[in-house]
Amino acid sequence: MNCKKIIICIALGMAGFAANLSATEPATAIKSHKAVDAAAPNVYWTDANGQVSYNINAKTAPVVKIALNLFENDMKGVTGYAAKQKTTAPIQIFQLDLLSNKEFSSLEKLGAPVQKIITTKDAYFIGVRKKKLIVVGSNARGTAYAILELSKMAGVSPWSDWYDLKPQPRKSIFTPVDQQWIGIPRIEFRGLALNGSKWMNPQNYSRIARLMLRLKCNTLWQVAGKHDATYNKAVVDSFDICIADNYRVTEWTGKKHKKKHRKTLENVKMVCDNAEMPIENVAPGLVLDMLNNRDYLETKSERREKSHRHEAHNDEDCAWIANVTNPKKAPLQLAMMSDLAWNPYALKAGIRNYLQSWLNNLFGSIAGKKIQPLMEEYYRLTSIRQPAYMAMPYGDTEFHSGEFGNELERFLYNYDLLKTKTVNIEKTLPANQRDGFFEIVKYPIFSAALIAEKELEAQEARDIARPGLFQKDDEAKAAAAVSLSAYNTLKQLNAYYLRLGKGKWSNFITINGAEMQAPQLPGTLSANEIKRLKGEAFDRDQDLQPLVNFTKPIIAKNAYDYTSYTKAPAPKGQAAQEIELKPLLGHSNKAVKLPKGASLRYKFASSQIGDARFTLAVIPSYLSNAKNMRVSVSIDNAQPVVCQMKEDTSSKDGKFSIWRGQVLKSFYVTLLDGYHTIVIKALDDNVIIDQWALDFDVDREYYVFPVLK
């Protein structure tokens, strides 16, 4: 029996160990390895000229060659020289399933822990052995992932190509001899379900496939009646991508990649599985909750009882699929999903810290620290109203210019402040980061702001104008002028993006969506009228008064501003479930998830007397299998009022709730002045409280809860 066969037999005998390892260890674990040669603390990838070199086994799969090409170009961006292949190179790469006996023997002599990855698909090892950086993949994809992991270690973000980001130049690159990384996927099938992508051509599919490769995703998903994508076979084959059709995954296996292997999946987590809510229209905090919540598992047979899921489900046979229309619009959400699919501890420090680290990797720590507040405010404002939902098919939004000193203009003013901060930070960035900053930060912020201004000012013009008298109503015309000016600026912004990189993103920039169309106005204006009337419009800098001036008869709070809380009852022999704060989720940008039986308590004083309307806002439930999402509210120890917050997402009310990102329920109470208490309790699982308001003007209509900061 030859050496290679002996090792494989030993590895197969340790398959159980390897499976347990993938479930318990971080997927990309950094481990200490005792140095053999204390005089050589680092292994340098670069030679005296700064050029990186590598060597690889003789036979490799097409996807490995693609990864090597990307790596070579990545190193050119970092060092100024493309990486080159060299027999004596400091980086030695091995694709396990295509090694010759001689190559396998050489690898064995280097002491790499092959047994930890050999039986696991897509796994890899990177570490120093005998003064060489050893890179080993269990199969073609694992080898490709490991190669591109080297790019990440050198400072090249997986998103660099997609956002035209230049890595920081380095004269040398090295790895300490005591470091090693073992990557074992936690989720076997990880990928995308592309919606509305019939416009995609092979070149664009190739770009998406490259992104998937860098994110270590391996599956494109299609379910009849849900996803209309038709995938390009040549691209799929060359990138070794699995195709899933109606819960059956097909992949090519074997040394010559000619054997079809089909697997039926019972447990699948469809992230944002709704045609009207692709992942780019969902707050990062909610995406994270979906990823961490087993109740979002979907089964082929529709057997979704919890007992079935907990008994049958394990991560290794599960697929995570993100429903996405345009990957360029959801980089943070997709990055979170891909990282968690490999490492269950990837967001252990919290989503805000993850966002900070993600931005640091893109722009450097100094710029990243400045950009983070911009993105957090962007996620807050878009959680109040996503740009895609600004153009209303069922009439106007509920924004009301007559309440709280004009809440409509106050909302737009927050965008004005955000735009100003964005421009100021842009000026501080080096030229090689400007394009990436525009694509990741400035364009999302400015387009969201301009869409909001276009639609809300048009709504204001329609509300003000009397039938047939638009041309005689200067106030209505001024609002229309602001709307049209925003529309013209939006077109210029899109045109700039379409020209970026010689037009390489022209097919990815959506300029024909409802939110991009001309505003619906009660009349027309000439260019000269737009310019003149815009100067007569509501001046947000001068005309807006402090919100506190308008909130005497209303108490509004974010859910996280509680006085105290009560944990859920503890199951026998287990610890009580804690409440969870959910940053980057909700109008509050920090909603509170309550386990069943947990409650929040608020204490406050009010000088108001009489009837009041209490309104509770929770995050909509997207769980099709959940029948109830009940919350009880008790004011001043009165009999609790039970509110059913679960809605049919296909109903008109359900759509309104999705568009505003909140389900609202109200009831009336009569109160005296003095101190009051409110207790909000979850009666079912998956209850996420966002805000509440107690309004003594019971007929008031408004959209944004007037929470004082």
Give the location of each predicted region:
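Intrinsic-disorder/low-complexity accessory segments
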Residues: Q92-G155, R207, L215, A480-K534
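Aromatic-lined carbohydrate-binding surfaces of glycoside hydrolases
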Residues: V52, N57-T60, V64, T79-Y81, ...
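Sec-dependent signal peptide recognition
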Residues: N2-C9
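Bacterial N-terminal signal peptides
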Residues: C9-G16
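Substrate-binding groove of N-acetylhexosamine-processing glycoside hydrolases
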Residues: D178, E266, E280, E298-P571, ...
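Beta-sheet entry/capping signal
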Residues: P90-I93, K132-I134, F189-G191, N218-L220, ...
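Contiguous, structured surface segment used for ligand recognition
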Residues: A23-G183
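Extracytoplasmic
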Residues: N139, L521, L525-K709
